């Protein structure tokens, strides 16, 4: 999970900063990641058992498939319903793929200023596809990359939630996942109703 959170920052440093700052930022980020993963002692209170749950491989695969379905139904691929604001976000994502970084619009003398972290890894993976095969192929790949990246993130959130809840039975795991999924916006119901 820490690597998932660190990756967009690493891509930002590499793609948006000048070389000396990028190298320094990446070095600090790599050290912080290494320290957090390898050197930070696990903090436990006296008498507290170590938290952990066991999930079989089929359950892990099913959970990832559920996260893929959730992302698909949420509009990640563009093949299913998307709220009206997806048009703006798709344009920003496309600009991250088709323009050099940092994204600058000379006709308006302005830069792309937005919270772009979630798109940076899929956009970086898509840039070579755009360079080799053009926009149509790149956009298809980009939608799949964003879908996979989002599914991975929600998968890690779901796993961490299940550990936090100590969901050690199928019933507890199901309730935890229902809570996670239905805690979010339910705007699709409005779209289906209209």
Feature-to-residue mapping (PLM):
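Alpha-helical transmembrane segments
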Residues: 1-8, 59-70
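Membrane-embedded, hydrophobic transmembrane alpha-helices
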Residues: 1-53, 153-156, 165-166, 172, ...
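Hydrophobic alpha-helical membrane-interfacial segments at the cytosolic entry of transmembrane helices
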Residues: 58-66, 174-181
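Long, contiguous, compositionally biased segments that the model treats as domain-scale units
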Residues: 56-59, 72, 76
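Membrane-interface helix-boundary signature
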Residues: 52, 56-59, 139-142
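Short, mixed-charge, low-aromatic patches
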Residues: 46-54, 76-83
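Active-site lumenal/periplasmic loops and adjacent helix-entry segments of GT-C-fold
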Residues: 73-194
């Amino acid at each position: 999970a820490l690597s998932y959170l660190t990756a967009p920052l690493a891509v930002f440093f590499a793609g948006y900063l000048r070389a000396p700052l990028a190298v320094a930022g990446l070095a600090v980020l790599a050290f912080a990641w290494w320290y957090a993963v390898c050197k930070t002692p696990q903090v436990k209170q006296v008498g507290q058992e170590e938290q952990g749950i066991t999930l079989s491989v089929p359950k892990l695969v099913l959970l990832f498939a559920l996260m893929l379905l959730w992302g698909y139904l949420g509009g990640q691929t563009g093949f299913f319903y998307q709220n009206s604001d997806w048009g703006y976000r798709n344009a920003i994502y496309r600009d991250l793929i088709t323009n050099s970084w940092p994204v600058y619009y000379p006709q308006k003398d302005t830069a792309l200023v937005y919270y772009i972290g979630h798109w940076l890894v899929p956009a970086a993976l898509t840039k070579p596809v755009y360079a080799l095969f053009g926009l149509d192929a790149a956009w298809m790949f980009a939608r799949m990359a964003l879908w996979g990246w989002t599914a991975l993130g929600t998968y890690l959130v779901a796993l961490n939630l299940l550990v936090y809840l100590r969901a050690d039975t199928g019933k507890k795991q199901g309730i935890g996942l229902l809570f996670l999924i239905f805690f979010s916006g339910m705007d699709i119901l409005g779209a289906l109703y209209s």
